[in-house]
Every structure is written in C-alpha cells, then in structure tokens.
Amino acid sequence: MVEGESVRVAAIDCGTNSLRLLIADIEGNNLREVYRDMRIVRLGQGVDRNKAFAPEAIERTLVATQEYFDLIRAKDVQRIRFCATSATRDASNRNLFIDGVRDILGISPEVIPGVEEAALSFLGATKGVGRELAPFLVVDIGGGSTEFVLGESEVLAAHSVNIGCVRMSERHLTSQPPTEKQLAEAVFDIDAAILEAGSHVNFKTAHTLIAVAGTATTVAAAALGLVEYDRYAIHLARIPAQQVHEVAEMFAAMTREEIAALGYMHPGRIDVITSGSLVLSRVMRLTGATEFLASESDILDGIAWGLAAL
C-alpha cells in the first residue's frame, strides 16, 4: 500500500461456530469499518467426535460464503482473505469445503495453523490498546480451540489448545443445565489444557488479560447487566474475575429456555455459552488474572490489518 492511500479489504474468519466478515477501509493506522457481520453456521458440528465435516454443515457455510461474496463484489473490495481455523484443521474431509469456497470466491481459503491464528488475534485485539497496559495476554476462546498469546508490540509466545466452546459442549456438557459430573469432567479437561498452554506461555508476566470472541463478549454483556447486546458498551470494558465466575455459575444453573430469553444472547450461542463461560472462568483462576479487558476487535480485525500491509 502506498503511503497516504486507502485500501479496501475484506476479511473472512471461518471458525468452528461462526462465519464472520469485515469489510474495511484502511489507511496507515486507521481502520474505517464499512461492513461487519456474523453468521452462526456451526461448521464444526460433530467434528470433535467424527473428525469430519457433516454435509449439512458444509452446505450452511457455503451458502453464507456466497452471500458474503455477493456483498464483497458490491463494495468494490481490493483485497480479500478467507481464513479457516480449528474445525477445518481437524476435519478429514476439509478438501470438500476448501474446494467449495474456492469455487465461490475464486481464491483458495487458507487453513491457518494455531500459531498464526494466535498472532492474528493478538494483532486485532491489541491494535487500539495503549502500550502502557502491556505486556498483554490475549485469550481467544473459539468454537474448537482457545488461543493464548503473550506479547507487547509483537508476539513473544503463543499456544493453541482444543478447548473451544462447541468442542466442550459436544464432549462434556450435553445437557442444560449440565450435571455436576459433566461439569467436573469438563473442568478436568479444561484445566489440563490451560496448564499445557501455561508451559508454553508465561501467564505471570502479563500485565493485562484481553479476552476476545463471542464467549468473552457475551460474558461481558452479562456482567455489565446489558438488556441487549451493545458492542460499543462491551468494547474495552473491564470485567472483574469474580463476576466472570458468577456469570459462569449463572449459566450453568439455567435451562436452555432461560438462556434463550436473555436479550443479549445470540441464538447461535445458546447451547455453547455454558461451556464457553466455564472455559473463561477457569482461565481467570489458573492465570491468576483479577480482571479481563473485553475486546470486540479480534482475529477478524487482525486479518484485515494484515491484508492492508501487503
């Protein structure tokens, strides 16, 4: 990009639970959002158990991809990147999905490794945060995996573990509310993964824990007492650890219908918020963080910034 010129980019993040699009104009250190959207497609449905995509999950995701491509064409986008993460890494039939996306977009989707996923999440989450809050520990709780990224202006260490909210729901929390046995088994699994991440990433050196993605922002909405979801109220809100634990316990005690009735709850997150909030609660306990900074900027924004730098 020539200095002083703006470039219009389209970033697509394809996770285990959601497909998201960001179209933005970027000039220097300024990002102007043109369009942002999320669809719950649950591409990773059953992948933890079957190690393969369900045909209906591929179909849902490709339909949404086509709708996104129609928008991208209408917005005169100059650069586009499609990044697929945890579920696509794990699926034995991922080539069926990759070929389908290529046929729609005319470019190959990138199945990025956990380390790159972590770096992009870090870039997106920390871009607009004051350096006086560094070093940062960015925690990205996705549908299939959770990334832990430590850094200041650059990533110093990162590790990805398979404790996403969809994976934990399918593996452990199969009823709502979950049983004590299900919760205990989930905690055992989650804690082991966090401790593994801690052997690669020194949690104690971080000054600020930034939590990104839908689990963290939904927990923030609950902690803030929002009547409906408000991304502007959530972004950069400080949520004390005790409130995280209380929110996780609240979700674990509710029925599916009670969760669905919450005004800030996205319909596609109803069956995974209990597991997701449990992961975040265990992260707070095992890292020793006293609060987290909620961020609406994440891997999607990181993909966009990366495109502008090409």
Each language-model region and where it sits:
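Helical "lid/coupling" subdomains associated with nucleotide-phosphate turnover
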Residues: 6-9, 23-26, 46-77, 85-135, ...
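Ser/Thr-glycine-rich phosphate-binding loops at phosphate-binding pockets of nucleotides
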Residues: 16-18, 85, 142-148, 214
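Short aromatic-hydrophobic micro-motifs that form the base-stacking/packing surface
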Residues: 10-12, 81, 137-139
